[in-house]
Design a protein with these regions (language model features):
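HDAC/HDAC-like amidohydrolase catalytic core signature
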Residues: 1-97
Length: 97
């Protein structure tokens, strides 16, 4: 079984709610425009990845990389989280990210 599964996510979320992390602010990650992703990855690479996303089930790009129908959303949100975190620090709304 691949390590990416709903139970793993729940374990991470449970761990982040433990005492050492309770003071951290949490924000919903926005879905970033893929044009911003193309600022750090070649457009052909982004296009190839997007085209590899299955309509159903899973696709293994390599032994460690599994894609499912919601992989694009996950990619856009994880990238969006990074951009949002930097924006908050640069705006002075956060001291670190």
């Amino acid at each position: 079984m691949h390590p990416e599964c709903p139970e793993r996510l729940q374990t991470v979320l449970d761990g982040l709610s433990d005492k050492p992390f309770r003071h951290l602010s949490r924000h919903e990650a926005p879905e970033i425009d893929l044009k911003l992703v193309e600022m750090v990855h070649q457009p052909y690479y982004v296009e190839n990845i997007v085209e590899s996303i299955p309509d159903q089930g899973r696709v293994h790009l390599d032994p460690d990389t599994v894609m499912s129908p919601r992989s694009l959303e996950a990619t856009r949100r994880s990238s969006g989280a990074a951009v949002e975190a930097v924006d908050r620090v640069m705006a002075g709304d956060a001291t670190n990210a």
